[in-house]
Amino acid sequence: MRPESRAKDLPSASLPASLSVLALRFKIFYAKHIKAENMLSEQIIKELQKILGKDNVLTSKAERICYSYDATQQSFLPEVVLQPGSTEEIALVMKLANRERIPVFPRGAGSGFTGGSLPTKGGIVLCTEQMDQILEIDEENLVATVEPGVVTERFQKAVEKVGLFYPPDPASLKFSTLGGNVAECAGGPRCVKYGVTKDFIIGLEVVTPTGDIITTGGPTMKGVVGYDLTKLLCGSEGTLGIITRIVIKLLPLPEAKKTMLVLFDSIDGAAQAVSAITRNKIVPTTLEFMDGRTIECVRQATDLDLPETAQAVLIIEVDGDREFLDKQANRIAEIIKPLGVVETRIATTPEESEALWQIRRSVSASLRKVNPDKFNEDICVPRSKVPEMIRKVDAISDKYQIPIVNFGHAGDGNIHVNIMVNRKVSGDIMKAEGAIKDVFKAALELGGTMSGEHGVGIAKAPYIPLEITPVAAEYMKAIKKALDPNNILNPGKIFLDSPEN
């Protein structure tokens, strides 16, 4: 983000007092007004059935409940769920919805952490899960074309079978869809070397909110004719168009990879190690970290071997030609040895590599031993600022007297801040909301951002004024207005709607 688009000050007065109050207001308002204002008539349902076929228009309450929630654990009941099978069907649906002013909420797998796919105004959930074809893998040009409902891991395995590689690897890859990945510009551990989703998307087919079908970009590695709508749509959270086809750049599959787990006596040592590695012209595939509190959670919840003296962990993975990997791993171990290393473990087999990664994969389940509920934020700061950010988070934890544990992608400064609460304990939610705002402010003070991967949705929307200036926000809203004049596509996401709108 350019400097001029950042807010110079951090006004707290412009924000709602609490996210739970905000969520409650959402539910009260929509519970009162959806039926009166947005209930779909029998005629509208018949028109939708004519477009999609009766089996692809879900109206029973049981079916609609299945599409009412995402990973935030919030739930809003849509009036109908649509399962289109083609771009043309989606275009007809959007023309109808735009004509009748019916809100439409695009949905992939519903794996998001910010409420981006929640049908907060009832209306239509348009789910692209049936559009799940890998249309082409072009081995000669290193390009693939897919529909939006293709599951990320399935696609990765398909291209790897022919010796190709799609690097973005969000934690949800076993069930998230590529359409959702594009809408949120998903990241993952391998982003430190290869980049995020938008770095691999070179073309899109999209249905606009008014029902037009447009294509952006294409299967070429270069293209500068007109505005770059592909990049605009990538990360737009389903507010500007519905993705119906994706053109993806691929890479040759690396021959091999090698995994290391390094334990440090301080978070500062781990951060210095990250800088030292990159300064020595080594770019690992992954540089994952866990702080001392996270290590303690894993130690208490599992029988995994983690020394008491370890206050930070780096999981480092390198890939490339097999003959160079041992040399590269040994060079990394040599570089970081003076930085407070407690122990270094280098995998020599795939099984040993999996055992090292098991320590990282056990984190989420281990956190539930601390408290049953969590707010999972994903701030990002310059990587040299990671230790300072961790110290600020520790101070925020002490201030509000609630546990906060941190892990994430050290290579790009993306910290997953997990604020652990018990919703049944009076006052815990209010404490968490105060902590969340303080965490966001601390990240911004260090030159960071409130979200590196998860997006804004409704969860972070109240905090937009902390990061985006009013002038920059108005330009963003102008883009939305131009593409969606009636504000029917995923309304209320990124920028909150007022009840009057």
Feature annotation, model-predicted:
Residues 59-61, 65-67, 251-252, 258-435, ...:
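C-terminal substrate-recognition/cap domain of FAD-linked oxidoreductases
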Residues 35-95, 111-142, 171, 294-303, ...:
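N-terminal flexible segment immediately upstream of the FAD-binding catalytic core
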Residues 21, 31-34:
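Short hydrophobic alpha-helical segments enriched in small aliphatic residues
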Residues 54, 444-456, 485-489:
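Alpha-helix capping/hinge segments and adjacent helical runs
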Residues 133-290:
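FAD-binding subdomain of flavoenzyme oxidoreductases
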Residues 1, 6, 12-27:
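Short Gly/Ser/Thr- and charged-rich N-terminal loops/segments
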Residues 212, 461-501:
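Activity-critical C-terminal alpha-helical subdomain
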